[in-house]
């Protein structure tokens, strides 16, 4: 059989109150229970939205909208969502066992229209282990998760192998996939189909009779023309008797259900409370013992924590004292590092300034040379300018003289004049007023000798000047170097100081070379000193931890002793660990074994109960599974024999029934064809003529006529001949006797009567011998006698058949019980008792726990000793390598000595660094300081004076030479007057004058340019001197600041300072870390002590309270046990499998049973009062009284004429067997009565008959549905009279209207419309065309009228309208109609989808509190019979006993609203298979 698809779960993501909630849907009924606003309607709205994601249809009304012409703007969906991405998903499993997840992504659209965006999607191939919430959420941390958008969901699913994700752009495609996969019952091709589907769901959701559906039932229930199907003959008359019988069975079944309900619920109610009290008593005893153990353990823990607190407080005080010293040392180290870094920066500046000073010194020297060269060039330019001036003056004078010389006289005259001028100039220059031309030669020799002497003197001075200038510059340079190194001093002291400085420089340079070795040595010694101090600190700490002072010589022996102790303790700890592991492993194995036994115990107990029941039913004792299988084989053999005997009796009974039916025919005809032939031939049956024969004569006449006793007596055989031609519908042998039926006698035969026989002489050569029959059937009296005997035999056979059927049913039920036992319990039924083993294991577990506790205490002590020894060895491992340091007492003195030497070397290094360059420059020129060139200025003046004297002597000699040369010109005195101008000479002189003036101008410009350049050179020199002086001053300031800092600024000083600071920082950090750890541990220890103190007080209080409670409860429990044993109900109540359930589960089980019992005994005053009294939780014995009262009540109600037992449980089993037998018998009878109808000629009539039969089949499923006063619901389908007349004319009188159908101008539809108008002229067709009317007439649905009727109370059958029914009745009736519609859709769509698909079937019901318990139960039975899932929303006062119930409570926590959901499985037992078979029988027969 194809399994029906089921909705597995509904998942809501980010809905109002539901962030990520999955509701597992029951296979039948899922109940959403909760108060107003709990979220029931929101859950159903999410389901409907995923089923029909059409915003044009979705409208979740609210009761506050009553009377409003339009709903809220968002139609109830926008407000049910939260901001962001939301999902609603349905997890389904179809008939092919394919898992399909369909759903929609919803998101609020911003704006005042409050719109919602919906995107449908489907997921196929998803593994069963993957939950829907895992797909659409991503966990961020333990308390946060986010909802994945649709694109991320698609990427996530595409990454999973075998999983298909489909997103739909149209709702039609979405619904098409759902139809093909068997999720919805009908293919929704258009918006109209979706609207019908939504109206169906909406009517189901809000309950009641939907006018939208009832007005258009034909559209919902009747499919379109889909071909011709066979029709079935109306079985109403044949089924009426069965229904009446089944009604009687239902009445009896109600008693059976009441018995079963009362027993099961009373047993659950009392047994759950009984076992809960038993469990609680055991739990209280265990808790009291556990409290006592915990009290002892907590006292020990408190003492240990107090000791620990004292130790940690002492250590914390020590660390607090050491932290101040470490902070001071660390601050000092940080300040020292800052000073070193500052000194290094100062040293870098000093080096940089010294480099700059060296560069400035070089540039200054170069600039001095440049200035000196510029001065020399300036002097040359001045001399050149002066010579140019002299030449211009001379040319001007010559031009003036030569202007008068026009001829030779003029030349002589000019010469004369020049000679006179030269003589005058010579007088002037030589200071010889008496000089004459004649004496000039004498004076020339004198002045030439004087010039030579002046020249020699000048050259000598020039040589001295050059040498003095060189010595003067070296002396100044050496003197400045000495001043720079030593400071101001007298010039005469420079030589001695310079020699002393050079000797000191050699010594300082030698010391400076020792800086690096000394620094390395100091660093090494300081490191050893720190290690020595660290070793001393470690030794002091070790002695403090050991509580004893040790000498250095004792440490190695102590180390060996501790290592030996560690080795021994390590072995002990190792062995203890192995022993503890073995104990824990055994404990875990015991615990695992106990858990497995506790899980197996309920199964074993259930198997034992089942085995005991089987033993009681069959009266056998079974000791092994082989006994069970052997007995099952015997049972099968007995069942086979009983079935064979029952079938034989049934066959005989059927034969008797057929014979009675045959003998009951009027006229005694055993063949109906004989009556028809007799009527056709105009004769009478021979059996009718002899119908009044007596019972005594009946054997004679039966033997007399023999086979011809069924003959037909006709008046004339000749008239029959023509009828015999072609006769086929007759018996194989047909006897005809000619005679008068009114006066017929037996004279037609020649007869000889014998004893109990006759001989009939048929002809001369043919006789017939016939004996008298033992059971004559000739004549009415014989037949009646036979019928009477057959009835008696039939009664015997019926009773025997019933007995055999009962035995078969009982054997089958026993066989089924054995089969269930073999399938469920055989594997564990004959195993050892797990409870006995659990008791043994628990005792062993207690021993192990005690051993583990003792072992842990011993191991803890060893571990503490091991840790102490290990810490000691660790400390010694750090101390022993430093023993030589601890023994070195002179290390600190050596460090101080090396530090002093390093200071001296560093001072020397600073001296060398500061004055090394000056000393290097001073060393090669120090000898110039021996003599001071003080006469350099006088020499310089003498040199200038000798230059001037040499120049004057040269001019005097030149002037005298010129006079001597012009001595002849003096004789031209007479030609002076005769001078005349010579223009040519004049012009030449003028040209030379212009050239001389141009040269003079150039000389002047060059002099001015060079003067400006000289001025620039002097400015640059002054700037360089100023920069040099400034830099020098800054360098001196920096050197003074470096000396003021007082820190050695060498290359490794910063690294040593940083290492020292980091070491102190590490020590300070470690100290602080340890101090913080101790503070935290101390705080934790104090808190732990406080907690232990509070725990001790609470444990003491709980222990005494629990002890008092155990003592108090003992008296009540003894009373309960006494009452249970006195009434013999311990076997019913002491259900050991319930001992393994929790108290909450048992209390829930008892509460559910109590709710069901309140409804069950509502009509019984006695049981109601006893039940009310039993609800007192302080009086558990009253529940036992109620259970005894229920049993007594049921014993009184057992019908002893039907069921012969005093035990209500056995009575229920026998009643189930009897009802199953009756149901099976009536079902088989109904199947025999179902005969096929005659086929009809018209396709419309056949289709109508088919759909009428289908509606009748739907009605059969609703006949037993009752809601309140409504006893039954049915759907009436009638053919309209006008259309029925049209069908009759079409099938039988169509020849009369051939003018319409043979017309070429009319189509068939139009001809059909014309015929309809012709037959019904009184009907106004309106504006519709014949074509439209004809198309409507071709649709068989227009021939039918449908309406829903209910059988309500004394009113009988009436039309189902909401105004005539109560709210609950309207809900139940509307639900019945919807079930019919769903079944109709499935039948219609079966041919469209796969043959192996049976679609899901689910409806809703909101606010189910309007239905009473009987109506709810009816819905449950309807769902079970129709394999339909139902989602019910009900307040908290409804607690269905079947299906799955979700308790919804909406809560607000920290401004966050969420719905708390608790799911409960149904606790009512399932209906037996035979009853389910009875319920399904009508639909199978249909």
From Swiss-Prot:
Indicate the secretion signal residues: none
One GO CC term on file: cytoplasm
Give the residues annotated as coiled coil.
326-418, 444-480, 509-603, 835-923, 977-1115, 1209-1266
MF-aspect GO terms: ATP binding; DNA binding
Question: How are the domains described in the entry?
Answer: The hinge domain, which separates the large intramolecular coiled coil regions, allows the homodimerization, forming a V-shaped homodimer.
Q: Which family is this protein grouped under?
A: Belongs to the SMC family. MukB subfamily.
Query: Which NCBIfam families does the protein's record reference?
Result: PRK04863.1
Quaternary structure?
Homodimerization via its hinge domain. Binds to DNA via its C-terminal region. Interacts, and probably forms a ternary complex, with MukE and MukF via its C-terminal region. The complex formation is stimulated by calcium or magnesium. Interacts with tubulin-related protein FtsZ.
| Entry protein name | Chromosome partition protein MukB
Task: Please state the gene responsible for encoding this protein.
Answer: mukB
């Amino acid at each position: 059989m194809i399994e029906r698809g089921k909705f597995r779960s509904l998942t809501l993501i980010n809905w109002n109150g539901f962030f990520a909630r999955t509701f597992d849907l029951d296979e039948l009924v899922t109940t959403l229970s909760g108060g107003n606003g709990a979220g029931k309607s929101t859950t159903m709205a999410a389901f409907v939205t995923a089923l029909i994601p059409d915003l044009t249809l979705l409208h979740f009304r609210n009761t506050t909208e009553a009377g409003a012409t339009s709903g809220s703007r968002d139609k109830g969906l926008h407000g049910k969502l939260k901001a962001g991405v939301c999902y609603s998903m349905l997890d389904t499993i179809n008939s092919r066992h394919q898992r399909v997840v369909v759903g929609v992504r919803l998101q609020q659209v911003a704006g005042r229209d409050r719109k919602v965006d919906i995107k449908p999607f489907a997921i196929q191939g998803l593994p069963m282990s993957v939950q829907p919430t895992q797909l659409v959420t991503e966990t961020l941390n333990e308390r946060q998760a986010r909802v994945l958008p649709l694109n991320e969901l698609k990427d996530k699913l595409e990454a999973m192998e075998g999983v298909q994700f489909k997103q739909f752009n149209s709702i039609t495609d979405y619904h098409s996939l759902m139809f093909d996969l068997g999720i919805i019952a009908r293919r929704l091709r258009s918006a109209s189909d979706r609207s019908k589907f939504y109206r169906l769901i909406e009517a189901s959701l809000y309950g009641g009779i939907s006018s939208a559906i009832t007005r258009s039932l034909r559209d919902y229930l009747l499919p379109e023309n889909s071909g011709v199907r066979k029709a079935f003959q109306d079985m109403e008359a044949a089924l009426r008797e069965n229904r009446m019988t089944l009604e009687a069975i239902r009445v009896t079944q109600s008693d059976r259900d009441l018995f079963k309900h009362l027993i099961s619920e009373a047993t659950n109610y009392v047994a759950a409370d009984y076992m809960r009290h038993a469990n609680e008593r055991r739990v209280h005893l265990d808790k009291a013992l556990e409290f006592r153990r915990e009290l002892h353990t907590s006292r020990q823990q408190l003492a240990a924590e107090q000791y620990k607190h004292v130790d940690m407080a002492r250590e914390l005080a020590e660390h607090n004292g050491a932290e101040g010293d470490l902070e001071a040392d660390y601050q000092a180290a940080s300040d020292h590092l800052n000073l070193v870094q500052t000194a290094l920066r100062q040293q870098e500046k000093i080096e940089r300034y010294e480099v700059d000073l060296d560069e400035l010194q070089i540039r200054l020297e170069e600039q001095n040379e440049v200035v000196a060269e510029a001065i020399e060039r300036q002097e040359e330019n001045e001399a050149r300018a002066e010579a140019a001036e002299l030449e211009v003056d001379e040319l001007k004078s010559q031009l003036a003289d030569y202007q008068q010389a026009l001829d030779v006289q003029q030349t002589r005259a000019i010469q004369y004049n020049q000679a006179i001028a030269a003589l005058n100039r010579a007088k002037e220059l030589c200071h010889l007023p008496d000089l004459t031309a004649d004496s000039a030669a004498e004076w020339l020799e004198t002045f030439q000798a004087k010039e030579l002497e002046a020249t020699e003197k000048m050259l000598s001075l020039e040589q001295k000047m050059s040498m003095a200038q060189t010595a003067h510059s070296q002396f100044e340079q050496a003197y400045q170097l000495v001043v720079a190194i030593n400071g101001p001093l007298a010039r005469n002291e420079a030589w001695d100081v310079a020699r002393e400085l050079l000797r000191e420089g050699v010594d300082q340079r030698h010391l400076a070379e020792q800086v690096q070795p000394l620094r390395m040595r100091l660093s090494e010694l300081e490191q050893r000193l720190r290690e020595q101090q660290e070793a001393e600190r470690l030794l002091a700490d070790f002695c403090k931890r050991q509580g004893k002072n040790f000498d250095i010589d004792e440490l190695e022996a102590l180390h060996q002793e501790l290592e030996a102790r560690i080795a021994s303790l390590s072995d002990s700890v190792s062995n203890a660990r192995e022993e503890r592991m073995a104990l824990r492993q055994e404990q875990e194995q015991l615990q695992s074994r106990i858990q497995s036994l506790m899980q197996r115990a309920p199964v074993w107990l259930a198997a034992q109960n089942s085995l005991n029941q089987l033993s009681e039913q069959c009266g056998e004792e079974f000791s092994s599974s082989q006994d069970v299988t052997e007995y099952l084989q015997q049972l099968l053999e007995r069942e086979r024999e009983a079935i064979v005997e029952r079938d034989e009796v049934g066959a005989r009974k059927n034969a008797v029934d057929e014979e009675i039916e045959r003998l009951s025919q009027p006229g005694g005809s055993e063949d109906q064809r004989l009556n028809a032939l007799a009527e056709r031939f105009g004769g009478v049956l021979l059996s009718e003529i002899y119908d009044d024969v007596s019972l005594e004569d009946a054997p004679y006449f039966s033997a007399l006529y023999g086979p011809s006793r069924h003959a037909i007596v006709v008046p004339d055989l000749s008239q029959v001949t023509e009828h015999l031609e072609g006769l086929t519908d007759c018996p194989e042998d047909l006897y005809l006797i000619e005679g008068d039926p009114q006066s017929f006698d037996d004279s037609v035969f020649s007869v000889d009567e014998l004893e109990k026989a006759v001989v009939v002489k048929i002809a001369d050569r043919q006789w017939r011998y016939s004996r008298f029959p033992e059971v004559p059937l000739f004549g009415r009296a014989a037949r009646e006698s036979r019928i009477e005997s057959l009835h008696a035999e039939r009664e015997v056979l019926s009773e025997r058949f019933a007995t055999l059927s009962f035995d078969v049913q009982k054997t089958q039920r026993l066989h089924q019980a054995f089969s269930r036992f073999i399938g469920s319990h055989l594997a564990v039924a004959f195993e050892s008792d797990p409870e006995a083993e659990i008791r043994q294991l628990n005792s062993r577990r207690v021993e192990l726990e005690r051993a583990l506790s003792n072992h842990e205490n011993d191991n803890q002590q060893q571990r503490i000793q091991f840790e102490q020894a290990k810490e000691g060895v660790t400390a010694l491992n750090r101390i022993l390598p430093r023993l030589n340091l601890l023994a070195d007492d002179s290390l600190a003195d050596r460090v101080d000595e090396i530090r002093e030497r390093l200071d001296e070397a560093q001072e020397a290094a600073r001296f060398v660094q500061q004055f090394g360059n000056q000393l290097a420059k001073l060393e090669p020129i120090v000898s110039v300081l021996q003599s001071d060139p003080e006469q350099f200025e006088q020499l310089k003046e003498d040199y200038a004076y000798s230059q001037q004297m040499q120049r004057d002597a040269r001019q005097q000699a030149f002037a005298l030479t010129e006079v001597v040369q012009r001595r002849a010109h003096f004789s031209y005195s007479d030609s002076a007057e005769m001078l005349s101008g010579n223009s040519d000479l004049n012009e030449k002189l003028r040209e030379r004058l212009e050239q001389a003036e141009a040269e003079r101008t150039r000389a002047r410009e060059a002099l001015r340019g060079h003067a400006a350049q000289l001025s620039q050179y002097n400015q640059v020199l002054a700037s360089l001197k100023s920069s040099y002086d400034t830099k020098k001053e800054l360098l001196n300031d920096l050197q003074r600041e470096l000396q003021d800092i007082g820190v050695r600024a060498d290359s490794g000083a910063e690294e040593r300072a940083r290492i020292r600071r980091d070491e102190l920082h590490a020590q300070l950090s470690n100290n602080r870390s340890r101090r913080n750890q101790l503070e935290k541990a101390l705080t934790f220890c104090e808190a732990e002590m406080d907690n232990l103190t509070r725990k001790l007080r609470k444990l003491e209080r709980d222990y005494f309270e629990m002890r008092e409670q155990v003592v108090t409860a003992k008296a009540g429990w003894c009373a309960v046990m006494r009452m249970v044993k006195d009434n013999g109900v311990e076997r019913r109540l002491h259900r050991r499998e319930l001992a393994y359930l929790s108290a909450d589960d048992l209390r829930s089980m008892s509460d559910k049973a109590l709710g069901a019992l309140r409804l069950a005994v509502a009509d019984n005053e006695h049981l109601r009062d006893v039940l009310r009294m039993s609800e007192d939780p302080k009086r558990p014995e009253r529940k036992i009284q109620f259970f005894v009262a229920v049993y007594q009540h049921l014993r009184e109600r057992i019908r002893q004429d039907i069921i012969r037992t005093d035990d209500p449980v056995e009575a229920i089993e026998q009643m189930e067997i009897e009802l199953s037998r009756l149901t099976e018998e009536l079902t088989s009878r109904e199947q025999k009565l179902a005969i096929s109808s005659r086929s009809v000629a018209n396709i419309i009539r056949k289709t109508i008959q088919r759909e009428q039969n289908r509606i009748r089949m739907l009605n059969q499923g609703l006949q037993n549905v009752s809601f309140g006063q409504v006893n039954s619901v049915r759907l009436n389908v009638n053919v309209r009279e006008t259309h029925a007349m049209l069908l009759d004319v079409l099938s039988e009188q169509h020849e009369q209207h051939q003018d319409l159908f043979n017309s070429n101008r009319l189509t068939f539809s139009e001809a059909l419309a014309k015929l309809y108008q012709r037959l019904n002229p009184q009907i106004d067709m309106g504006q519709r065309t014949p074509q439209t009317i004809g198309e409507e007439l071709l649709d068989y649905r227009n021939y039918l009228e449908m309406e829903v009727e209910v059988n309500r109370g004394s009113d009988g059958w009436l039309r189902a309208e909401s105004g005539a029914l109560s709210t609950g009745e309207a809900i139940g009736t509307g639900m019945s109609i919807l079930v019919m519609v769903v079944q109709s859709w499935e039948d219609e769509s079966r041919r469209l989808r796969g043959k192996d698909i049976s679609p899901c079937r689910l409806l809703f019901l909101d606010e189910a509190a309007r239905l009473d318990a009987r109506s709810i139960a009816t819905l449950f039975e309807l769902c079970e019979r129709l394999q339909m899932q139902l989602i019910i929303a009900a307040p908290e006062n409804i607690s269905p006993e079947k299906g799955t119930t979700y308790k919804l409570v909406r809560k607000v926590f920290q401004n966050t609203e969420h719905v708390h959901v608790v799911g409960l499985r149904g606790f009512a037992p399932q209906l037996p298979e035979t009853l389910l078979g009875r319920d399904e029988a009508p639909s199978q027969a249909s």
